[in-house]
Amino acid sequence: ASFDAHERKFIVDLWAKVDVAQCGADALSRMLIVYPWKRRYFEHFGKMCNAHDILHNSKVQEHGKKVLASFGEAVKHLDNIKGHFANLSKLHCEKFHVDPENFKLLGDIIIIVLAAHHPEDFSVECHAAFQKLVRQVAAALAAEYH
């Protein structure tokens, strides 16, 4: 589904205010704390026994920034999200063997983080636009899975 002018404005305007490093670290940390079984994908990041370890893990913070920066590319490619994420989908499917359900979970967490960091901007219309965006990104990342 394509984005109308109002949805695009909500997405672009809010994204311009996002601190990618802070929100990315927050989003990935939240996923690893709320869904501890997801830590198995990141065992090489070192000690992650509890929330404190995760919140202070520099590798989690760096990867969170990388993940959210990649998500931000969707904002620049609203007309071709699936095409833009084709290589990343293949990588996560074939090399990392990530369960595609993780993309939906992380998308939902990104929504929570954006709302928490930008409550004054996160109207119900903005929420709807970003929910549509995270669904499309999750579907694009899952496209290589059979």
UniProtKB/Swiss-Prot annotation:
- Quote the tissue specificity entry: Red blood cells.
Q: Which UniProt keywords apply?
A: Acetylation, Heme, Iron, Metal-binding, Oxygen transport, Transport
- Listed InterPro entries: Globin, Globin-like_sf, Globin/Proto, Hemoglobin_b, Hemoglobin_oxygen_transport
Source domain of life is Eukaryota
Q: Which GO terms describe its cellular component?
A: blood microparticle; haptoglobin-hemoglobin complex; hemoglobin complex
Q: Name one GO biological process term.
A: hydrogen peroxide catabolic process
Q: Which residues carry this modification: N-acetylalanine?
A: A1
- Record-annotated residues binding heme b? H63, H92
Q: Which GO terms describe its molecular function?
A: haptoglobin binding; heme binding; metal ion binding; organic acid binding; oxygen binding; oxygen carrier activity; peroxidase activity
Which residue range or ranges hold the Globin domain?
2-146
For whether the record's keyword set contains Lipid biosynthesis, the answer is no
Query: How is this protein organized at the quaternary level?
Result: Heterotetramer of two alpha chains and two beta chains.
Instruction: Report the sequence similarity comment from the record.
Output: Belongs to the globin family.
PANTHER family on file: HEMOGLOBIN FAMILY MEMBER (PTHR11442), HEMOGLOBIN SUBUNIT EPSILON (PTHR11442:SF7)
The function of this protein is: Involved in oxygen transport from the lung to the various peripheral tissues.
Full protein name: Hemoglobin subunit beta
Q: What species was this sequence derived from?
A: Alligator mississippiensis
